Amino acid sequence: MILAVKTRERTELIDVTSEISQLVQKSGIDQGLCMVYVPHTTAAVTINESADPSVKSDMLMVLNQIVPWEANYRHLEGNSQAHVKSTLVGPSQLIAIEKGRLVLGTWQGIFFCEFDGPRNRKLHVRIMEEHFVQ
């Protein structure tokens, strides 16, 4: 399954937990795994606190401190920092499914991380059922 994600800012975190949870519920799978993958070199996916929006701001602030917009980058397309940030955050997450629901902590959410927007992006979701061997 592919989720379309339309980003509006150059750098932003978008909570996609609800959309992914709906896909898991529609799958009818009781127990298994949900893999979320970003097929872009300037975007990523992460799991972090979703209750307090200031956490998203803090994450972006720290990433901008670690990887500044302007530096002596050799890649001349103007988005080198986006490539580095996406590498640090990572392109995928694997979440357990139990009783038909994603296993996330009380405050956890799944975030699409845009580092070179705005753009139309894709988020691949694979839902795999667990089979027990006897």
Located regions from the model:
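Active-site histidine-anchored catalytic micro-motif
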Residues: 1-134
